From Swiss-Prot:
Any single GO CC term annotated in Swiss-Prot or TrEMBL for this entry: cytoplasm
CDD domains hit by this protein: Obg
Keywords of this entry: Cytoplasm, GTP-binding, Hydrolase, Magnesium, Metal-binding, Nucleotide-binding
Location of this chain's protein in the cell: Cytoplasm
Top-level division of the source organism's lineage: Bacteria
Quaternary structure and interacting proteins, as annotated: Monomer.
Protein name listed in UniProt: GTPase Obg
Class in the EC hierarchy, top level: hydrolase
Organism whose genome encodes this protein: Jannaschia sp. (strain CCS1)
UniProt-annotated binding residues for GTP: 166-173, 191-195, 212-215, 279-282, 307-309
Listed EC numbers: 3.6.5.-
Domain Obg: 1-159
Pfam families with a match to the protein in the record: GTP1_OBG (PF01018), MMR_HSR1 (PF01926)
Annotated residues for binding of Mg(2+): S173, T193
Length: 344
């Protein structure tokens, strides 16, 4: 399935049906009086989070969504039928933005969440509504209210527990394939991964989700390479796993390149808990490994070592990540359970 994380959508709710001007016509009833019914309400436009989606690709093929108009009222006090609603189905993690792409309307994080993005117009009153003591036979009715037209943007930020970062060919996809059922494309050339991949990882009976983000390069924040387009997908993560290619000639420079791009991106991304791992240690001579370990340890602090191919040190890395994820989940639960303090 192709990946799309940004879509522009034009929506319109249904207009209300017009009221009816009608009079009761029956045998032997000379002055039947007004009996025009009200118009039906226009359909609403909803956005709903559903299970099983992880892309906005459906909105590439259809960008216009119109709810149905309400039916007009009829004689014999019959109200018109309401217009059918329309529902836009999106994956969890979708942000709904105004046309300026900056004003946030809603952040939809959980399956089942549903918001009304455009309310249908009200139906107009029939002439029965305008009958009074001084006007026994009104010949007026209200037209239905117009629907709402608006343009919105849908922006997907994948919901994962851990974000996987590194330069191209750092071994991110190999790590994801070795630890989960995900099958990302793996090859010996840069930018093998062009879109984010998700994988469910299990360790010691616990599971969490890792997002493999396409490789960053120096200047990504300025649009070089694939740019920093996909960094938004790790903003929701509890922790980041930064893989450094152990076979690189300058492991310190590679590490600092990614850190600089995180800081250039802005927000709280650079402040997130981060685990740094020297990858591909099975392809390095012991003496060279010791030198690179010492050099990288000076700038990265606590450094872990692993090999996605040989699976050396992988379990240890997963356990550290799991501890970070568990701590984040516990903090989220505690925040929900904490009662509001009583204030006089």
């Amino acid at each position: 399935m192709k990946f799309l994380d940004l879509a522009k959508v034009y929506i319109r709710s249904g207009a209300g049906g017009g009221g009816s001007v009608s009079f009761r016509r029956e045998k032997y009833i000379e002055y039947g009086g007004p009996d025009g019914g009200d118009g039906g309400g226009g359909g609403n436009v909803y956005i709903e989070v559903v299970e099983g989606l992880n892309t906005l690709i459906d909105f590439r093929y259809q960008q216009h969504f119109f709810a149905k108009n309400g039916q007009p009222g009829m004689g014999k006090q019959r109200t018109g039928k309401d217009g059918a609603d329309i529902v836009l189905r999106v994956p969890a993690g979708t942000e709904v933005l105004e046309e300026d792409q900056e004003t946030l309307i809603a952040d939809l994080e959980e399956v089942g969440q549903r918001i009304c993005i455009a309310k249908g117009g009200n139906g107009g009153f029939g002439n029965l509504h305008f009958k009074s003591a001084t006007n026994q036979a009104p010949r007026r009715a209200n037209p239905g209210q117009e629907g709402v037209e608006r343009t919105i943007w849908l922006r997907l930020k994948l919901i994962a527990d851990v974000g996987l970062l590194g330069l191209p060919n750092a071994g991110k996809s190999t790590f994801l394939a070795a630890t989960s059922n995900a099958r990302p494309k793996i090859a010996d050339y840069p930018f093998t991964t062009l879109v984010p991949n998700l994988g469910v990882v299990g360790v010691d009976g616990a599971e969490f989700v890792i997002a493999d983000i396409p490789g960053l390069i120096e200047g990504a924040s300025e649009g070089r390479g694939l740019g920093d387009t996909f960094l938004g997908h790790v903003e929701r993560c509890a922790a980041l796993l930064h893989l450094v290619d152990g076979t690189s000639e300058d492991v310190v420079g590679d590490y600092q390149t990614i850190i600089a791009e995180l800081e250039a991106y802005g927000g709280e991304l650079a402040l997130k808990p981060r685990i740094t791992a020297l990858n591909k240690i099975d392809a390095i001579e012991p003496e060279e490994l010791a030198k690179k370990r010492a050099a990288l340890g000076k700038v990265a602090g606590n450094l872990m070592e692993m090999s996605g191919v040989a699976r050396t040190g992988v379990t240890e890395v997963l356990r550290v990540l799991r501890a970070r994820v568990d701590a984040d989940r516990k903090a989220a639960r505690d925040a929900l359970e904490e009662p509001d303090r009583w204030r006089p």
